Design a protein with these regions (language model features):
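Alpha-helical membrane segments of multi-pass proteins
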Residues: 1-256
Length: 256
């Protein structure tokens, strides 16, 4: 069954790949025109890495696997909102980020909005509805992605420890929802149900399928998903600080 989901060549998102290649080309031109940063320096490599992870996460056949269980889905969400944004922002020269800072964007409002939308996203009724309406689902995820970039901007540019701490606090409701659903809920996966519906597989047939072994698609899977989200977010914060310090050290020494 898993092989069937991955064998279709059309699950590769070639329009997205073309768009990312164009974005990389524009980045290289701007980098060579307005900065002295070399393509092989840390910042460009982080920028390219962020786009590579983005494509693997949502544009490759691996994106099909993310719907098979909540823990795999949460890894995808964590990469999209906690790993890719800081890598992307770290890859942008400091002068450009300072221009964004001067716009006086209400980053705290973006953080609260993200937390609310992210919490509602993991309510079973909302997730069931979104899984059956792909355009609305993709628009919802795009909005969360934009908000996540705004959230990480003060953490990357200012190394704002207070804001970083708040970003972890506001994620607790969504993490707690998954963990409590695993402890007291049914353990059902609306994303998997939506995928099977698109393949014309009935609920009774779905129950008889063993796509992934335990603890996937069980209550334990929801608990693992909640813990994964907290762990990856914390890891992303620590990684961002470390990479930022290396970039600052490079700027001081003048080496790549």
């Amino acid at each position: 069954m898993l092989f069937f989901l991955l064998e279709d060549p059309f699950v590769w998102n070639f329009p997205l790949l073309a768009g990312l290649i164009i974005l990389c080309a524009i980045y290289i031109v701007l980098l060579r025109t307005y900065t002295e940063i070399k393509i092989y320096d840390k910042q460009p490599l982080l920028f390219f890495l962020s786009l590579t992870i983005l494509y693997i996460t949502i544009g490759s056949p691996l994106s099909s696997i993310n719907h098979l269980s909540f823990s795999l889905h949460m890894i995808q969400m964590s990469l999209l909102f906690f790993v890719i944004p800081p890598l992307f922002l770290l890859g942008i020269p400091e002068a450009s980020l300072l221009v964004i800072k001067r716009l006086n964007i209400p980053f705290l409002a973006a953080l609260v909005t993200f937390a609310i939308l992210f919490f509602f996203y993991h309510l079973q009724a909302v997730l069931t509805y979104l899984s059956l309406h792909s355009y609305i689902h993709n628009s919802y995820l795009l909005l969360l992605m934009v908000l996540s970039l705004l959230i990480w901007q003060p953490i990357v540019t200012e190394q704002n420890k207070r804001f970083a701490f708040l970003s972890g606090i506001v994620l607790l409701p969504a993490c707690s929802l998954l963990i409590l659903s695993g402890l007291f809920g049914s353990g059902t996966n609306p994303l998997l149900s939506g995928m099977m519906a698109s393949l014309c597989i009935t609920p009774s047939a779905l129950n008889s399928l063993s796509i992934l072994p335990p603890p996937f698609n069980t209550r334990a899977d929801l608990i693992i998903a909640g813990l994964l989200m907290m762990g990856i977010h914390k890891f992303a914060l620590l990684l961002t600080v470390r990479l930022k310090n290396k970039i600052l050290a490079r700027d001081l020494t003048g080496s790549g």
